[in-house]
Amino acid sequence: MEKKKAFIPLLYLASIVFLPWWISLSFNKSLESWVTNWWNTGQSENFLNDIQEKSIIKKVLELEELFLLDEMLKEYPETHLQKLRIAISKETIQLIKMHNEDRIHTILHFSTNIICFVILSGYSILGNEELVILNSWVQEFLYNLSDTIKAFSILLLTDLCIGFHSPHGWELMIGSVYKDFGFSHNDQIISSLVSTFPVILDTIFKYWIFRYLNRVSPSLVVIYHSLND
């Protein structure tokens, strides 16, 4: 009976780890055809207009060089110009297809992540008992560690997440999340998040040390500051 009680929280933990991957894969496959059909039938005419406008303007500017080249080659034979116009038309069609695929990808991934978040939230609420058991295990494990190990672990974790060498890791992680939601890479937004988010975390962590650890374990705070210095 005790083994069964211990097995259920472990099974719940494993399901939390693998459930997001399974949900994402399943809904991506099932929603792909529906989103593609919805987008291509014109029902999305007014959807994401601002984003589309910027994207299309950028692509049109890229094509301007080809049109300028067309003007420069007017002195060439008509057959040569005809081939050039055909090539430009094909390139334009290809850009439109790529634009549609990007928009479909954005909508699909954003919808999938929202659905995944809702399902996981409901799953966490329904599994509240298992979460309580897992939390008690974690607290017992941390309680049995010495203050030195705790301080070393906190220092290692903070240096990895909010240390002076962490921006590259944050850039990769935020870029990965940004891509997972289906948005195209944007250096300005990612740089802004990288420069602000770790600072916010660092402030919260220092406040936590000041308010919580000073009250619960003063010796741990002393060891932490000694290692940090």
UniProtKB/Swiss-Prot annotation:
InterPro entries: CemA. The keyword Signal does not apply. One of its GO terms (biological process) is potassium ion transport. It is a multi-pass membrane protein. This is Potassium/proton antiporter CemA. Contributes to K(+)/H(+) antiport activity by supporting proton efflux to control proton extrusion and homeostasis in chloroplasts in a light-dependent manner to modulate photosynthesis. Prevents excessive induction of non-photochemical quenching (NPQ) under continuous-light conditions. Indirectly promotes efficient inorganic carbon uptake into chloroplasts. It comes from Cucumis sativus (Cucumber). It comes from the Eukaryota. Disulfide bonds: none annotated.
